[in-house]
Amino acid sequence: MSKPTREEATEAVRTLLKFIGEDPSREGLLQTPDRVINSYVEIFSGYGKDVAEILNTKFYETCNFQDFILLNIKFTSFCEHHILPFNGTVDIAYIPDNCIVGISKLARIVNIFARRLQIQEKMTVQIAESVQENLKPLGVAVKISAVHSCMSMRGVMQDNSVMNTMHYTGIFAEQQKYRHEFLNLTAKR
């Protein structure tokens, strides 16, 4: 599949405007197709980014960390089913084996995966598995809590529903006490 040109993408937006009953040549909509394409370039900038590159700078520490937890990383993504936004928070914990990364790197990983068409379940796994693969910690725990526009703007029209997904690797998957501690910490907000 070849990537459409910017002009083809802009024309597709004009076609969608016509489809919903709008006139793309009216004054308020003249620049809308270009604005939509510019927005999409930014919103979906996670494609082509390499998580391994982000996690390249590691700190090899001799101190013995019990665990490392970063809570409340905010994100907005778009569901691949309706191309509507879902937004929420990501909590990440890992138990280092011999290296750690700066905390901003974890937020950058979230942004890479959030800036793609997604489903929350897959994004949860992608974040956890990328930390596991690149840092090789004893275990990783990831929890995502999000509100989905596809539930609030259409269909069942439930605007207060929050979806929670979790994924565990290593010691978090193997030992309940680590999962329990992680879930207790994430629930205290």
From Swiss-Prot:
Zn(2+) binds at C79, H82, C150. GO terms for molecular function: GTP binding; GTP cyclohydrolase I activity; zinc ion binding. Keywords: GTP-binding, Hydrolase, Metal-binding, Nucleotide-binding, One-carbon metabolism, Zinc. InterPro entries: GTP-CH-I_C/QueF (IPR043133), GTP-CH-I_N (IPR043134), GTP_CycHdrlase_I (IPR001474), GTP_CycHdrlase_I_CS (IPR018234), GTP_CycHdrlase_I_dom (IPR020602). PROSITE patterns: GTP_CYCLOHYDROL_1_1, GTP_CYCLOHYDROL_1_2. SUPFAM superfamilies: Tetrahydrobiopterin biosynthesis enzymes-like (SSF55620). Gene3D superfamilies: 1.10.286.10, 3.30.1130.10. GO terms for cellular component: cytoplasm. It catalyses: GTP + H2O = 7,8-dihydroneopterin 3'-triphosphate + formate + H(+). Coiled coil: none annotated. The keyword Nucleotide-binding applies. Its EC number is 3.5.4.16. The keyword Flavoprotein does not apply. One of its GO terms (biological process) is tetrahydrobiopterin biosynthetic process. It holds the Pfam family GTP_cyclohydroI. Pathway: Cofactor biosynthesis; 7,8-dihydroneopterin triphosphate biosynthesis; 7,8-dihydroneopterin triphosphate from GTP: step 1/1. Belongs to the GTP cyclohydrolase I family. Homomer. This is GTP cyclohydrolase 1. It comes from Rickettsia africae (strain ESF-5). The gene is folE.
